[in-house]
Amino acid sequence: MGIFIDQTGYLPVSRKVATTTFPCNFQLIDSTTQHAVYDGVSTDSGMDESAGEQVYQLDFSKVNAPGHYYVLAGNGERSHTFVIGEHVYKQLQLDLMKCFYFQRCGCALTSEYAGEYTHAACHTEDAVFLEDYMNQTPDPPHFDMTGGWHDAGDFGRYISPAAVAVGHLLYAYELFPESFQTSLHIPESGNLLPDILNECLYELKWMLKMQADNGGVYHKHHYTLRI
């Protein structure tokens, strides 16, 4: 049971659909006035194989007025309150961009910029080639590979995903520079560069360290525990 909506919200001109696992009549309620602004009937969308449940759509796309709303089914079930508005994705964009800062490796995240998610500088040791490490080569060459972003929920840092992420961010800025002028509240904020470029630079400086003398690029920098 339950009524599932987009908790980020809906643009006024976008399609607006909630989903349920039961057929119903429904109303869209203005949460400020508690008045119904739309009445509708669910439509059967068939079986969702991944969920193993029958799914029904509650379409209220005709409602375009900005405001706070919730969906109320005829059986009394109601959704969380959500927003219809022009700027529903703005905070989501800022949150997504700030995620790159929280992935930073090799520097301390302080409460000024990270709030409760602080930690000391991590993974600051020099790197060695995996073969030298596994073979316990005496006095192997050491490399400064500090910096960059942690990748994929672990402590590895990989050139291929890094290049894709930085490339997409730079291309997004090239196409829509006006959309990336808001401060992300990172240590570099206020240095006359948009923070999307500041964050890309943090990763690019690490990527430069990963380039070998022959022009090639090492694939990844990771951590191995000897047990």
Model-found features: residue ranges?
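Catalytic cores of eukaryotic secretory-pathway lumenal/extracellular enzymes that build
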Residues: I29-S31, T43-G46, L96, L169-F176, ...
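Short capping/connector residues at structural and topological boundaries
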Residues: V13-R15, D154, F176, H222
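Short S/T/G/P-enriched beta-strand
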Residues: V13, K90-Q93, M97-Y101
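Acidic/aromatic-lined carbohydrate-recognition and catalytic surfaces
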Residues: S50, R78-L94, S179-E199, K209, ...
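Ligand-binding face of N-terminal immunoglobulin V-set domains in extracellular IgSF glycoproteins
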Residues: G2-H87
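Extracellular structured ligand-interaction cores
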Residues: P23, V55, P66-H68, S79, ...
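Well-ordered alpha-helical scaffold segments within catalytic/enzyme domains
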Residues: A73, V166-P187, E203-M210
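Extended ligand-binding groove/face enriched in aromatic
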Residues: C99-P161, I186-I227
